[in-house]
Every structure is written in structure tokens, then in C-alpha cells.
Amino acid sequence: MKITYIHHSSFLVETESAYLLFDYFQGKLPEFSEEKPLYVFASHRHPDHFSKVIFDLEEKHPNIHYILAFDIWSKRVPESCKEKTRFLNPGQVLDDGTLKVEGFKSTAVGVADCRDIKRLCSIY
């Protein structure tokens, strides 16, 4: 596993089977291999945790999945990305076979979650 700090609360985790990008809104991103899926998380709607720039990543990485906190308005998601976007609520579990994500109530806004990818669990 490789963890790369991007900016503010944003970082990238690379595992054997996927990339996980957290709360990206600005900063230099490394190159992504198209062989692995890219999961993009936004923990809540504040502009230093969610920006529409994440949807530009689809052009360079077609195997992309967006997991957004329930408090982010769905109208902020471009039409071209709607099928690749899931909204996570506290108590909800999303599982696509590669990544399992469970939502928890946050102490602030948005959602905290636990990700399980091949026995690696991270809480954010």
C-alpha cells in the first residue's frame, strides 16, 4: 500500500487492486494506471472537501467510481457521471466486489466511512 498526501485533507491510497482518492479539490495528482479502478470519495459538501473538479478525472480514468456523502447535492454531479456516482448515508453499506464501504454518522457534517479492500480497512 502506498499513501500520497495531496493537499489539505486530500490524499491518495494505492493498493494492489485499486486507487482511493479522498476529499480532492486541488493539488497535483500522480499518474493513475488505467488497469486499477479509481474510487473518489468526498466526505462532505464543504469546498475544501468536495469540488466539481473531481468529475474531470473521468476523462483520463474511465474506470472511476464516485462515493459522495449524502449532504452533497445530486445536481452538482454532471449527467455524464451520474451512473458512476453513489451517495453514502450513515448506516449504509456499498459493495461492488472490489471495495466495500460502510457509512457512519460523523461528528461534524457529512459522513464518516470505513473502507474494506482485500482485508485493508481504513476509517476516514
Predicted segment positions?
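Short, structurally constrained coil/turn elements
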Residues: 60, 79-81, 95
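Active-site metal-binding motif and surrounding structural segment of the metallo-beta-lactamase
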Residues: 26-72
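Short secondary-structure boundary micro-motifs
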Residues: 3-4, 49, 70, 76-78, ...
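A generic "cationic amphipathic patch" detector
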Residues: 16, 53-55, 79, 114
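Core dinuclear metal-dependent hydrolase active-site scaffold
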Residues: 1-35, 86-124
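Short, aromatic/basic amphipathic alpha-helical patches
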Residues: 75-85
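Short hydrophobic/aromatic-enriched beta-strand-loop microsegments
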Residues: 65-68, 83-90
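A generic "binding-loop/recognition-motif" signal
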Residues: 9, 46, 72-73, 90
